[in-house]
Every structure is written in structure tokens, then in C-alpha cells.
Amino acid sequence: MNRPSRHLVDPQLLSLLDRFPALVLSMDNLPAVREGARQPAPIYAGAEAAAEVVERRIAGPPGAPDVLISLCRPLVTPGPWPCILHMHGGGYVMGAPSADAPQHRVLAAALDCCIVSVDYRLAPETPFPGGIEDCYAALTWIAAQAEALNIDAARLGVMGESAGGGLAAALALLARDRGGPRLAFQHLIYPMIDDRTCVTSAPHPFAGEFLWTPHNNRFGWSALLGETLGGPQVSPYAAAARARDLSGLPPAFISTGALDLFLDEDLDYALRLTRAGVPVELHVYPGGFHAFDFVPEAAVAEQARRDSRDALARALRPPPFCP
């Protein structure tokens, strides 16, 4: 059972809680919430960087519609660029690449990389496996078109926040198991990877009071999985924490807040990856709730953004030359 945790929140993060009302997702308010989730976060509004964003439609999974992707590329450097395949957050039920475009311009220019965002289909209209298959279609398209896109396929990785982090983790599993493109890294920011949280298991008592609550978590997972939620047949490509074998996966960066609903599942996944021989960089931020890193003025949020950017810079570097 959750206990009040406001006294544990970093004081510089309280402004976000005071500015935004508590979100209680339902089928009635989902259309309005989705519209808001398509807008860029205020922290990146008006950001300018030497990068361009172009949209393209690519072939979707067999029998499915085409997939809309956004490509963000530096304007100054000629490439070939390393590439990040990014999946947006939103509990599997909301979100869009448009919300991340300003942030991606900044990152693409700063890291000298190409960022491809996937407008994957959302639940409940498209339950599992529609969304992850859209992302896999984008991954295989990037690998196949790497030369034409001026991308260095040897430096291709996946990234996402929340549900996007869950998709990134699942995509790493799917690419391994299908013999798909080899990934250089998986960059998981407070990833949503275990449907059993708040269903058959409970997080620590101070987790999940703010922003992404147990109610919203159940809403998102139910939309994606329907009646299979919490059951033994849930696929690891829907909930990466369900995977029994984590060997052979790319190096992982995992970050989360100490008050995030996903803390326990993320810590457990990091430990299991480590035990499977996968290099893991793990960060837990005291006083941080879900999506705390969007607070521009908070030192702990600045640190989280810096750690994420620095880890990406390391992951995107060319491999050392060996004569």
C-alpha cells in the first residue's frame, strides 16, 4: 500500500507537482490527454539547434499500415552519423514523436547523431504486438537503408522513456531473438517493463504517488494486454522483465527516480542484466518521481539529463581503432 511521499520529494521538484493536477486516466479523458501529450514539454519549447526534422512513411509490419517516422539530422556535419532509434513514452496509450522533436534537435546537434522517432500505434486501439512490431519495422528499415541515410549501422542503438523505454528493452530482445540488426546499446529511462507491478506484485510503499500512479499503470497495461494482464502467458516482447534469458543483449543504461513506480522493476532488470553478463550503467535519483527530469530548474533533474547525455555520447563514439 502506498504511503504519503511528498516529504521525500526533492524540494526543487515540488513546483511540478504544484503546477499540474493529478492525472487519472480513463477512456473518457484519453482523447484530451492524448492531445496534450502531443505537445513539446515546456523545458524544450523554443529550443534552437543546428538540426533538421523530416517525416517519412515506411513499410509497416506485414498486413499492417505504413509507419510514420521522424528523422532528426545534424545540419553542420556530413556524417556518416551514429543513430538512435527513439520510442516516445506515454504508458502505451498516448504520446507522439512531435512532443520530442525540440529535444531531439538539441541532442542531434550536441551528439552529432541521427535520431529516428517512431509514431507507433497506440493501445487500446492497437493492442500488443502492434506497437512493438511497428518499432521493429523501423529498426530493420534503418539498418537496410543505413548507407542511403548516411548512418553508421555499427553505432545504432535504441532509447526510450517510460513506455518508450519498455519498447526499447523489448526491441533489444526481439532483435536478438530474430537475428535482426545488431544494437550497440539500449538506453532506458525509467522504463515501463513489467506488467506485474501493481497487479501480482507491489512496489515499495513510497513509490508511485505522483504523475504515474498504480491506477494509471494498470490502465496502460490493461489497454496493451487486455485479459492477459498479469498472467503467465505475457510475452517478453510486451513486458521485457518477463524474459528469462537476458544474455547477449547490448549494454544498458537505466535511470529512474527513487519515488518512481517503476523503481523496483527497473532495479531488478538491471541486476538480472548484470548477472547475464550485460554491461549496465544504473542511476537512481533521490527525491525523483516519474518524469522528474522535465523540471528545468531542479539540480537533480539537471544531473539526470547530464548523465543521460553523457552516457549517450559514450555509446555513440566510434569503436577504438585496432591495427
Residue spans of the language-model regions?
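Short amphipathic alpha-helix adjacent to the substrate-entry channel of hydrolases
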Residues: 98-117
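Gly/Ser-rich "nucleophile elbow"/oxyanion-hole loop immediately N-terminal to the catalytic nucleophile
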Residues: 143-158, 178
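Alpha/beta-hydrolase active-site loop
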Residues: 126-148, 308
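Short beta-strand/loop motif that positions the catalytic acidic residue
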Residues: 254-256
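Catalytic active-site module of serine/aspartate enzymes centered on a nucleophile-bearing elbow/loop
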Residues: 297-323
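A glycine/proline-hinged amphipathic helix-loop "lid/cap" segment
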Residues: 1-71, 316-323
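Hydrolase active-site cap/lid region
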Residues: 173-232
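Short beta-strand element of the alpha/beta-hydrolase
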Residues: 80-89
